[in-house]
Amino acid sequence: GMASKRPEDGPHLVYLPETPFCMDKFITDVKEVYDRLGRCVIAVSEGIVDETGLPIVTKYMENIERDDHGNISMSGNSALGDVLARLIKDKLKIKRVRADTFGYIQRCFLGCVSEVDQQESREVGEKAVHFAVAENKSGSICIKRTGDYLVDYELIDFCCVAALTKKMPSQFINEEGNNITPAFKDYLRPLLGRNITEVAYLSSGKIPKIINK
C-alpha cells in the first residue's frame, strides 16, 4: 500500500490476522472493488484467523507442521491462496483469478531491499558480536524506536521474545478490517528509506476490446 499514489491503485484489500476473517464479508469486499474498478488486488496474511482464533489455512492443510515452539508453520503454503481464488471464481463468476503465494521471493530480491533495513541489520549483528565477545552475554538484540525515527539497540532475555508474536496495533487497521490506515503508513515510511521503487503509469487510455471469444 505504500507505493500507491492514486485511489484506484492496489492492493485494494488487505487482510491481517488481528481481524477475524469472514468468507462472506471477503466476497462482499471483493465484489465491491471489482464492480467499481474492473479488477481487484488483494494482500492476505497467511496467518488470518476465523472468529474463534483458528488459522483459516489449517482447515485446508492435510499435514499441519509446527516449529520448536509449537507455532503452526504456514510460510510458503499455497493452500490458502488456492482456496480464496477458487471461492472468488465460484461466488462471483470471475474467470481470471490468480493467487501467488510468496515464500522467499520478497526476502531475497535485492532490488527491493530497504537501505534502512540494510544498515540496521548490520548494526544488530555488530551489537550481537559485541555482547557475546566483549561482555560474554547472551540474549536477543532488540531494536527500540525513539522519536520520529531514531533507534537504540538493547540486549534482552530470550524468554521475552521466544515463541511470542508482536501484534499489529488496532490503529493501523481500518474499521472495516480490510486495509491499512494512514497511521500505519506514517509508521512504516521511515523504515523504507529513500530508494522505494516508483510506480509508473501509462498515459494512454484503454483500447476497446474487438475480438470476443
Language-model segments: residues:
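Accessory alpha-helical/coil subdomains and C-terminal extensions
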Residues: 2-98
